[in-house]
Amino acid sequence: MIDIKFLRENPDVVKQNIKNKFQDSKLPLVDEVIALDEELRQNKKRADDLRANRNKLSKSIGALMGQKKFEEAEATKKLVAEQAAELAKCEEKETELEEKVKNIMMVIPNIIDPTVPIGKDDSENVEVQKYGEPVTPAFEIPYHTDIMEKFAGIDLDAARRVAGNGFYYLMGDIARLHSAVISYARDFMIDRGFTYCIPPYMIRGGVVTGVMSFAEMDAMMYKIEGEDLYLIGTSEHSMIGKFIDQIVPEGELPYTLTSYSPCFRKEKGAHGIEERGVYRIHQFEKQEMIVVCKPEDSPMWFNKLWQNTVDLFRTLDIPVRTLECCSGDLADLKVKSIDVEAWSPRQQKYFEVGSCSNLGDAQARRLKIRVKGEGGTYLAHTLNNTVVAPPRMLIAFLENNLNEDGSVNIPVALRPYMGGTEKLVPKK
């Protein structure tokens, strides 16, 4: 959410930003919110005038009574009552206008970074760099669930009977591998100075609307019936939410947290849920990282965050590349975003395994995350990035470490988390 003062003073900049994001249907909202904001400010001025006059008249009643000017005192009391009634109407109108302004501001997209490439959708994202040499094996690589089944490591049919599509049972060596990757990612981030955090897996509605757009909320979040609670789609939500309504000392910044959590997503939209496979599902686990920092430090932290993911994947012998997300692919709160994609030898192409985003002060403005510095109080900047998200990451791991005989190599970095195992051997 952008600053209403910025919008008021720079309507053309906001409109051009909307055009750059190919959201032209939102263009009329700029003039609409400016008009509502002007009405709100005039209403507030009227309320302030009424309040001041009412208080002045109220104070005069005592003096009039002391001077035995009873008729004047009674007349003044009536005038105070009339002004109080008018003030109540103004205050009611103020609440109504504030809600209208807030609702419109919530759907006007954040101002994107000037370095973001202009494009309509993810097909126009721009490759930044490749890391590692993509593998083209001499043998055919099976679909990822077929690999897992050879280890008796997955049961989608049982999961479908229990919960429907979009769920899975992982077992045996594949389940161990899943847990090993999460544990390794946790320690990897701790070694890089991040504080490990186990957050709530449910958050209140006010936190949800503070960390994401209405469109994202509708497509992702599961609501608990009868409660003001939602299952998290990512632990970023609850980690950023930790700082809601806080004024933090500038000297304590940055806050760098990493967390493990289950994630729950409706995956409502064009992609939907896979009938077979674990690439897009309703429930999965993820190691996440977030940063709360000073505005001038957020570009530096942005580059550090996505580099962490690249470095981790390279220690697991998985080639990756980074993509700069174009304007049309950025969610409304994001200033800048880079996707990390892993190489799929089976498909001979890259696929997304993580996303790093700089939200600027958008989440901080909604959640009122403020910083107290020498020059006063200001809004923090927030950033987030996927460290690793099994089981999607397992697809890349299994394909890139698979041998022709069906065994899977365990990279050196992961062996301590697999009891020293160097290779997984299929059971079937």
Across the structure, where does each feature detected by a protein language model lie?
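TRNA-recognition modules of translation machinery and tRNA-sensing kinases, especially anticodon-binding
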Residues: 27, 130-428
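N-terminal alpha-helical targeting/anchoring segments
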Residues: 1-134, 149, 153
